[in-house]
């Protein structure tokens, strides 16, 4: 009996190494794009406590030193700007040390409520409940205008809350943060600062 010739059909063309590299690169690009989109969404959600991005404020010191108590049914929020020093900065580095007139916008639940400039403070009434506070450095320098700090808290009727925003210069960078301080520290910061009056620029 004559042998039967068996022919096998090719399973498919083998991919070249360049095609495999191209596919891997495409997967990485898609992954990076997805991660970037998620990062942007998370950033937008975090900044939702602030106000409109393009809003600008002007701040003037006030001769009075007002320290009111909460009105009925409300909490009272003090926000104090605390400027630090940079002992390690070179004396001639004006860029690093020039934060004494830093203007910071203060937002609450997506609305700008005021601003501080220099060692100053202001206050505002707030309904009880959970709230989200935001500060943003208003500056013509892009790196500084991207400085944000956030805090969330639950306000109680009749309570007074003191938030300290700190701007500390550095030789090549800076510290920009926001924290809730105890009432003793808060009262000291308010007593050591100038009351500021701010309004949105048209």
Locations of the language-model features?
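Short, low-complexity intrinsically disordered segments enriched in A/P/G/S/L with frequent Arg
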Residues: 2, 13-15
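Sec-dependent signal peptide recognition
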Residues: 21-28
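Short loop/turn and low-complexity linker motifs enriched in small/turn-promoting residues
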Residues: 38-202
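N-terminal signal peptide c-region/cleavage motif recognized by signal peptidases
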Residues: 32-34
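Low-complexity, intrinsically disordered short segments enriched for Gly/Pro and polybasic residues
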Residues: 10-12, 79
């Amino acid at each position: 009996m004559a042998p039967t010739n068996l022919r096998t059909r090719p399973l498919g063309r083998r991919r070249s190494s360049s095609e495999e590299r191209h596919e891997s690169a495409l997967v990485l690009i898609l992954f990076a794009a997805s991660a970037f989109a998620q990062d942007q969404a998370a950033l937008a959600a975090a900044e939702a406590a602030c106000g409109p991005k393009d809003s600008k404020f002007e701040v003037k010191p006030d001769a009075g030193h007002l320290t009111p108590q909460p009105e009925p049914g409300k909490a009272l929020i003090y926000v104090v700007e605390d400027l630090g020093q940079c002992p390690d900065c070179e004396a001639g580095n004006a860029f690093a040390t020039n934060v004494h007139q830093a203007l910071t916008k203060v937002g609450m639940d997506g609305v700008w409520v005021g601003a501080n400039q220099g060692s100053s403070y202001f206050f505002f009434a707030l309904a009880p409940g959970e709230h989200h506070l935001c500060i943003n450095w208003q500056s013509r320098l892009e790196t500084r205008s991207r400085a944000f700090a956030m805090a969330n808290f639950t306000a109680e009727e009749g309570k007074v809350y003191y938030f300290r925003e700190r701007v500390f210069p550095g030789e090549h960078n800076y510290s920009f943060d926001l924290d809730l301080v105890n009432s003793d520290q808060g009262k000291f910061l308010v007593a050591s600062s100038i009351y500021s009056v701010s309004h949105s620029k048209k």
